[in-house]
Amino acid sequence: MRVMIVEDQTMIRSLLESYFRAEDGYRIVASIPGAKQAVEVCRASSVDLILMDVQTENRENGLTAVHRIKAIRPKTKIIVVTSLIDCAVLEEAKKAGADSLWYKDSAEKRLMDVVRQTMDGEHIFPDAPPTVEIGMAKSTEFTRTELKVLRHLLRGLSYTRIAAEMGCE
């Protein structure tokens, strides 16, 4: 099975590669940091499975790439991989055409189970994101708006830009 890994963090990308190398039947044909690159790889050749991070190199949107890849290669299975703890990501991944979603906080064994199930035609989407500790609070204690502000902060936006993005004065 031909596998492409799209992950901007080198250490995470290497870890994901090691999971596939430890199992028979998988061949990593591309391991790249950017979503735009993934679309180009799919234009040039077929891939059986893609692990696609939501936010990749240069803030490229992995979900946009999922949509574009599915238009080019509808039979390619795509598992969205994320550490974002927002229910909106689940819905956006489904709308983009992802076949499954896996949270980075989950175990290696769980990823390989999701891979096998996805390749067998199942769609694996958790009911809700995992609960994560953010400082002294749990992710489940934040409102959608608070999570949206946190996401903007993680993207490096200024307070002024966040206010503008959220329609505040």
What are these regions (language model features)?
Residues 7:
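Conserved acidic carboxylate
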Residues 10-30:
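Two-component/phosphorelay signaling modules centered on CheY-like receiver
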Residues 31-49:
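Acidic, metal-coordinating helix/loop segments flanking the phosphotransfer/catalytic sites
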Residues 53-55, 82:
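Active-site residues of response regulator receiver
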Residues 63-75:
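Short amphipathic alpha-helix used as the core "switch/output" element in two-component signaling
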Residues 75-85, 98:
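A short, hydrophobic beta-strand element within the central beta-sheet of small alpha/beta folds
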Residues 89-94, 99-144, 148:
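Short, flexible helix-to-coil linker/hinge segments that flank and couple to helix-turn-helix
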Residues 135-169:
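Helix-turn-helix DNA-binding segment
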